[in-house]
Amino acid sequence: MAPTPLFLLLLLTGVTAEPAHPGYAEGDGSSCDVAAVAVAERREEFDGGRIVDISHYYREEMPEWESADGTGGGFLRLVRSMRNGSDIANFSELRLTAHSGTHVDAPGHVFDHYYHAGFDVDTLDLAILNGPALLVDVPRDSNITANVMESLHIPKGVRRVLFRTLNTDRKLMWKKEFDTSYVGFMKDGAQWLIDNTDIRLVGVDYLSVGAFDECIPAHLVFLEKREVILVEALHLEHVTPGIYTLHCLPLRLRGSEGSPARCILIK
């Protein structure tokens, strides 16, 4: 006997569908449900806290290197708009430096011969950018020197380390004006890491891995042999120290020495 229409209706109403986009309230299922009111929910954690987004979202007040004005209001523009009737879809235009917000550095950033030889972000090793990572707290009263590195007792075999510093406590990535007093690696700290550890990915919580006074010397040490990948301006505020699985994916920008990146940790 074929089920009655009423029975089919009861079966269908008893099924609870998972939202396709968990960050927004669901409409009636229509792709053009303009009458529904959607409320955007922005989160740092997903899947019950198992996945943590450690990238900073791009905004006008985000700091930029040696700028008092931050990213500015012109970095993201809606150039074609449905609302004013000029188009059937919205189209935005993005204008940023390659080292804005959470980003990676390629060897060509500080070595001109590497830049012209093609060592751009498209050549970075995804096997280094993805895998187990250790998050450590750095002593809050110092830049990252050789003595500080030695005091952290990072075990041999650890290949990816995220360094949380006073920058996170001071919320420097939430302040529009660039701050030269940020914490970073001194040249001797970078050299100690290269000489005494197996680290191949270095992550930090402000715009540069190198302290302001030794910014370029620290970069040169890290990138000279093209074995270390630098990830800068990470959002580490709500993450506890420990071991995670890191996934960090820059854009495939052929010819660029840097790229914005989306980085997540999985517990």
Swiss-Prot record:
The keyword Protein biosynthesis does not apply. Residues 1-17 form the signal peptide. Highly expressed in leaf sheaths and leaf collars. It is found in: Secreted, Extracellular space, Extracellular matrix. Its main location: secreted. Pfam families: Cyclase. One of its GO terms (cellular component) is cell periphery. May be involved in the control of plant responses to environmental stresses. This is Cyclase-like protein 4. It comes from Oryza sativa subsp. japonica (Rice).
